[in-house]
Amino acid sequence: MSFVDEAKIHVKGGKGGDGCVSFRREKFIEFGGPDGGNGGNGGSVIFVASSAVNTLLYFRYNQHIRAENGKAGSGKGKFGAAGRNRVVEVPVGTQLYDEDGNTLIADLNNIGQQYTVAAGGRGGIGNAQYKSSTNRAPTYFTYGTLGEEHCVLLKLKIVSDVGIIGMPNAGKSSLLSRCTASKTKVSDYPFTTLEPHLGVAYANGCELVLADIPGLIENASSGAGLGHKFLKHIERCVILLHLVDCSLPDIVSAYELVRQELKLHSQELTGKQEVVILNKCDLLSEGEVREKQKLLESSTKKEVITLSMGDELDSLIVFLHAQVKKAVVTEPSDTSFDPFLYVHYNKK
């Protein structure tokens, strides 16, 4: 299945049903009076964040989303039926922008979170509602109003506890496969991973969602390699798990290159808590591994964990789970986006 993380769509709420002009017609009742009912409201287009979908692939083949129109009113005071809402599931982490992609409309980053993208029109009023002491037989009514209609740009930023980052071929996909049941493609050449992968790891009662982010190379923040397309997915990770290939001749440069690309993409990324792992240590002797570990710790001023292919991973998962909980508690709340200040288009 293709990983689609952007889509431009057209949404339209249902038109309200028209009001009705009708008069009561029964035997022996000469002046029955008006009995035209109101029209039903049009349905709305509603997006719901769901864990059942992972990409925006649905919108590649369904670029026009519209809700049902309301039904017209009828005689005998019958109101028209309301149009059914069009409820569409989107992945958790979906952001809605205006057509130009400049204004954020909604950010659906919690399961079950809803947003009405295009409200339905109001139903028209039947002539029965216009009856008064001075007008016993009104013959006028109102038409139902049109539903809202917009072009919307959808962008997906996957949500995970841990984002696994590093240079191409650093062993990110292998680690994800070992920690979880994710069947990611693994091979000994760069850019094996062409799209983000999610997996859930369990150990000693701890549950952890990990994301394998495609490898970053120099100038990734400017679009080189696969960086420009996938750097944005790191923004939603609580902490970063930075893998460095132990077999590289210059591990410090490899580490700093990835950190630099994160900084160029967004200054906030460099502020995220980071766990550094020296991977593929089984390819070197213990002495060489110890030497490179000290070198990387001296450069990063962080504790560096060593990892080999045959190592047991439960303790690592428990450790990462504790770091995630700590980061969630200490992380300042994001005040840059207020859900009560969502842009809500006016009806046309």
Swiss-Prot record:
It is an enzyme of class 3 (hydrolase). The keyword Metal-binding applies. GO terms for cellular component: cytoplasm. One of its GO terms (molecular function) is magnesium ion binding. Coiled coil: none annotated. PROSITE patterns: G_OBG (PS51710), GTP1_OBG (PS00905), OBG (PS51883). Its cofactor is Mg(2+). One of its GO terms (biological process) is ribosome biogenesis. Mg(2+) binds at S173, T193. It holds the Pfam family MMR_HSR1. GTP binds at residues 166-173, 191-195, 212-215, 279-282, 310-312. Its EC number is 3.6.5.-. Keywords: Cytoplasm, GTP-binding, Hydrolase, Magnesium, Metal-binding, Nucleotide-binding. Its main location: cytoplasm. An essential GTPase which binds GTP, GDP and possibly (p)ppGpp with moderate affinity, with high nucleotide exchange rates and a fairly low GTP hydrolysis rate. Plays a role in control of the cell cycle, stress response, ribosome biogenesis and in those bacteria that undergo differentiation, in morphogenesis control. Belongs to the TRAFAC class OBG-HflX-like GTPase superfamily. OBG GTPase family. Monomer. This is GTPase Obg 1. It comes from Anaplasma marginale (strain Florida). The gene is obg1.
